[in-house]
């Protein structure tokens, strides 16, 4: 199916822009529960449909561009309305039936009702929308390339992290409804790698059979809070983590016997203790219950030992494409040095070490840096070294000691680059710069500053999370002279 142009902001009319001016009189008379027909113009950054009711921007979860829906107001805000679909009078040609019955209830499935080619078009447009909003230098001329998708946009997630609770006397494992602590049990999940769900559901059945105490959030009682299952795609090894309210895990030995007998792919069983009521999933203490403390993953010829807390990209198939895009964009020569900022466990920098003279990386999390250096050693890479610290502190120190990087790759969190780091990048002025972004909005904001010293060659979006509204991109820069 061709990518529909109604997923592009460029197809919006001037009238459409005028509709963004709120009509305060109308807004004052809108009530929760009020219904009205609404034509959906485009998708917002969270995948929600956007229409205009008497000039007031209205966000309708689950609605798609070109649809005519009957919307019911769920919230009235000073500058916008929120609504839900009561009925669809005219469906989008891109609307499909989601595979997961709970897709509209929990996060992570916000685009599952949208045909996949249209999802890819939307993600390319997300970048254009962000550029239009923040207007970095020359943005109208940027080469924003079509999103690289997946042949099969399902069964890609290598980790399932499900909350565990009792529902009607039965053990349930799944995700919370959006903006609540109401758990939705997930017996199946189309975006998870199948083996992760096989292990998850079998363990849930055993917890019920053995009557292991399940955590009760309201009374802060019970024991098992969360189950985490991670699969190493290259080796098939699986790690299972029980996150518990206490160090004690009743029926532990019976559980471990069943796992060893029935789930041979589980080679690592861990327990993480996270006591009391807290919004954090993980506690500080992790112990080995059975097997080995890590699982072994491979990526483009490199081997990584993943501990329970170690970060690794959730989509192994697309990660290979992502890192090849970074390699292609940097186009390193054998005599060039590379800085890997926000290095995590070193996956990006180590994947480039074979084409660089030297790789230096940094991260603020000591455990990640320890993993990065261990991964370098594990792969017999001698020209890569990682340090604990902030890039904006370490970069000037390295420059002062005579290390001037020829190239830099940055892979920041969703909050984007720190302003001090941007200044450090502009001061150190590496000839080559590649930015791996997981948030178009903060990318566009960072481009406002980075374009003082660099020009944008292209922005290549890549779909790391099909069926969601999340968008990643690789940006290549050339230094201004």
From Swiss-Prot:
Domain spans labelled TRAM: 29-87
Q: What EC number(s) are associated with this protein in UniProt?
A: 2.1.1.-
Q: What class of enzyme is it?
A: transferase
Q: Which organism is it from?
A: Lactiplantibacillus plantarum (strain ATCC BAA-793 / NCIMB 8826 / WCFS1)
Q: Which UniProt keywords apply?
A: Methyltransferase, S-adenosyl-L-methionine, Transferase
Spell out the family assignment given in the record's similarity comment. Answer: Belongs to the class I-like SAM-binding methyltransferase superfamily. RNA M5U methyltransferase family.
What's an example GO BP annotation here?
rRNA base methylation
Any Pfam family = tRNA_U5-meth_tr
Which top-rank group of organisms is this from? Bacteria
Name recorded for this polypeptide:
Uncharacterized RNA methyltransferase lp_3226
Where, by residue number, does S-adenosyl-L-methionine bind? Answer: 313, 342, 363, 411
Q: Which Gene Ontology MF annotations are present?
A: rRNA (uridine-C5-)-methyltransferase activity
UniProt-annotated stretches for the region Disordered = 1-28
NCBIfam families, sorted: rumA
Give the annotated active site: 438
């Amino acid at each position: 199916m061709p990518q529909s142009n109604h997923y592009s902001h460029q197809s919006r009319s001037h009238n459409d822009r005028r509709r963004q001016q709120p009509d305060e009189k109308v807004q004052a008379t809108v009530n929760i529960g009020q219904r009205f027909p609404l034509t959906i113009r485009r998708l917002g950054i969270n995948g929600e449909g956007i229409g205009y009711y008497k000039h007031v921007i209205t966000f309708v979860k689950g609605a798609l561009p070109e649809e005519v829906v009957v919307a019911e107001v769920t919230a009235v805000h000073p500058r916008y309305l929120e609504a839900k679909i009561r009925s669809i009078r005219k469906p989008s040609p891109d609307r499909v039936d989601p595979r997961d019955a709970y897709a509209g209830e929990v996060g992570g499935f916000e685009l599952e009702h949208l045909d996949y080619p249209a999802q890819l078009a939307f993600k390319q447009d997300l970048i254009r929308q962000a550029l239009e909003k923040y207007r970095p230098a020359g943005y109208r001329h940027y080469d924003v390339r079509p999103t690289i998708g997946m042949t099969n946009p399902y069964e890609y997630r290598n980790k399932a992290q499900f909350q565990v609770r009792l529902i009607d006397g039965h053990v349930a494992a799944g995700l919370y409804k959006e903006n609540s602590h109401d758990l939705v049990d997930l017996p199946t999940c189309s975006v998870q790698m199948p083996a992760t769900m096989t292990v998850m559901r079998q363990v849930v059945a055993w917890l019920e059979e053995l009557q292991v105490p399940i955590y009760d959030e309201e009374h802060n009682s019970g024991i098992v809070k969360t189950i985490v299952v991670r699969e190493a795609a290259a080796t098939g090894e699986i790690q299972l983590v029980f996150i518990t309210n206490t160090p004690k895990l009743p029926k532990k030995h019976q559980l471990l016997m069943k796992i060893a007998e029935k789930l041979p792919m589980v080679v690592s069983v861990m327990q993480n203790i996270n006591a009391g009521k807290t919004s954090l999933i993980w506690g500080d203490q992790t112990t080995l219950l059975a097997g080995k403390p890590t699982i072994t993953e491979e990526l483009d010829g490199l081997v990584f030992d993943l501990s329970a807390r170690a970060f690794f990209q959730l989509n192994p198939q697309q990660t290979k494409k992502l890192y090849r895009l970074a390699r292609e964009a940097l186009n390193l020569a054998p005599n060039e040095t590379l800085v890997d900022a926000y290095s995590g466990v070193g996956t990006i920098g180590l994947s480039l070490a074979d084409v660089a003279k030297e790789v230096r990386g940094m991260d603020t999390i000591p455990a990640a840096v320890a993993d990065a250096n261990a991964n370098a050693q594990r792969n017999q890479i001698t020209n890569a070294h990682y340090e604990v610290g902030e890039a904006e502190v370490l970069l000037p120190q390295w420059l002062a000691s005579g290390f001037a990087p020829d190239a830099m790759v940055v892979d920041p969190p969703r909050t984007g680059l720190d302003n001090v780091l941007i200044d450090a990048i502009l001061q150190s002025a590496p000839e080559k710069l590649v930015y791996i972004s997981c948030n178009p909005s903060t990318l566009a904001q960072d481009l406002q500053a980075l374009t003082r010293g660099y020009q944008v060659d292209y922005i290549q979006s890549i779909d790391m999370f099909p069926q969601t509204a999340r968008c990643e991109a690789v940006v290549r820069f050339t230094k201004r002279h």
